[in-house]
Amino acid sequence: MPTSTAIYSGDLRTQSVHTQSGETYITDAPTDNQGKGAGFSPTDLVATALANCMLTIMGIVSNRNGLAIEGTEAKIDKSMGTKPRRITEIKIDFYFPMNFSNDERMLLEKAAINCPVAKSLSSDLQQNVQFHYPSS
């Protein structure tokens, strides 16, 4: 059984369905590439998937270690290059609502930067990841 199904709807838009859950989303080409920008672009999803994967893996590590990271927010920005058109950099800033010891921070940060999506992307794509904690 496939993981998902994607259908081209026309007008530079796709609709995707997650097979197991039935959840759907659309993509729309960005305004700088002939689209309407009415939804995530495919490259937006790549950048967002990286942050989602990092949050998920940090969640797994936090569960194993009795930590709580609920409410942690990721701000994601991507930079595009040309010739060929591609993502050149993904910048992610994580904002934790709670503080952690240095050892706990290292554990969470190592988990994030080693997530499966991070390790699957080209080494040509710069991943700039910053972690922000409340001031003590």
Task: State each model region's role.
Residues 53-54:
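Alpha-helical metal-binding/catalytic segments enriched in His/Glu/Asp
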Residues 1-48, 59-136:
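Extended beta-strand/beta-hairpin segments
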